[in-house]
């Protein structure tokens, strides 16, 4: 059953163009037509191997990112632990609960705001020395527009042999700055 959210009641004037996943309109989960072409265009635009649109927004993308990192970890005998900046979105916490992952928080000194979490590469490196984390998770840019030094944090993660996972939900534009500030261009794994 497919139904547009406006339920056929016109209020913006564009509802007759609002179609959903019906024959000939392509489907997000099985893209073959215009959506597949758009994903291909996005891959070329961003310069990445493959783009797949999420169907449930950033929350689903966070779950997917954590699941992929969890599957790639080498030590599967220990309970999985991830090192994370404390300003992570609640979808990250829900994903950790769903995947049975423990969180060890990066708590920067002097940060008084719940939204601000100005972590440094040094803090990440120190945290990784004390942790058996399979990955590091940060939000960049955060809810206040701040972005830590991803290039240096990614280097610290690589030195420790763990991937850097970045929630970049508020930073799609970063690819188009010169030079690019996109987390993947700066060394993040996902």
Task: Please tell me what each predicted stretch does.
Residues 1-17:
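N-terminal glycine-rich, Lys/His-bearing helix-loop that initiates the first secondary-structure elements
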Residues 41, 45, 51, 57-190:
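Conserved PLP-enzyme active-site core in the AAT-like
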Residues 14-60:
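Conserved N-terminal alpha-helix of the aminotransferase class I/II PLP-enzyme fold
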Residues 3-5, 21-24, 30-31, 146-148, ...:
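Generic structural "secondary-structure junction" signal
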Residues 7-11, 30-33, 91-95, 121:
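Short, functional N-terminal and low-complexity linear motifs
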């Amino acid at each position: 059953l497919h139904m547009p959210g406006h339920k056929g009641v016109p209020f913006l004037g564009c509802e007759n163009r609002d179609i959903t996943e019906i024959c000939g309109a392509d489907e997000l989960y099985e893209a073959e037509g215009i959506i597949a072409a758009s994903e291909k265009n996005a891959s070329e635009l961003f310069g990445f191997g493959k783009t797949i649109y999420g169907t449930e927004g950033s929350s689903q993308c966070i779950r997917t990112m954590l699941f992929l990192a969890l599957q790639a970890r080498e030590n599967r005998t220990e309970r999985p632990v991830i090192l994370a900046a404390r300003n992570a979105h609640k979808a990250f916490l829900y994903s950790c609960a769903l995947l049975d992952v423990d969180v060890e928080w990066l708590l920067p000194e002097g940060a008084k705001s719940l939204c601000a979490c100005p972590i440094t590469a040094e803090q990440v490196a120190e945290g990784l020395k004390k942790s058996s984390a399979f990955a590091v998770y940060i939000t960049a840019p955060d809810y206040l527009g701040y972005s830590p030094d991803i290039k240096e944090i990614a280097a610290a993660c690589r030195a420790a042999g763990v991937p850097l996972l970045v929630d970049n939900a508020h930073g799609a534009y970063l690819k188009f700055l010169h030079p690019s500030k996109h987390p993947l261009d700066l060394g993040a794994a996902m």
